[in-house]
Amino acid sequence: MVDKSDLLRPVDVATRIGAVLFTVGQVCTIAGITKMQLDLWTVRAAIPTLGAKQRLYDADAVEHVMLIAQARDLGFSVDAAIEAAAAFRARTTRVRPGAIAA
């Protein structure tokens, strides 16, 4: 007798989440930042967004924002945080499904 659970296969959640788009409010909540911070970082760090009437961020962009927030929490200036996040992302480059092209 076959156990029905043997029919299941691993689920690649990262691929599915990569296709989800987040609103400004959702990104702020996830990253623990204000809309003003997100607006500034989006422009200064050239974080790509989608959406005509409302900015939307993919999981890759949210990761970028969270790295900047982490650096700010460590006491980095905004410019230093943006540079540190970019350097970290360059060192840890991986395939990011569904990422918005910059």
Q: Language-model segments: which ranges?
A:
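Arg/Lys-rich, alpha-helical DNA-contact motif
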Residues: 1-29, 43-102
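Key DNA-contact positions within bacterial/archaeal DNA-binding proteins
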Residues: 36
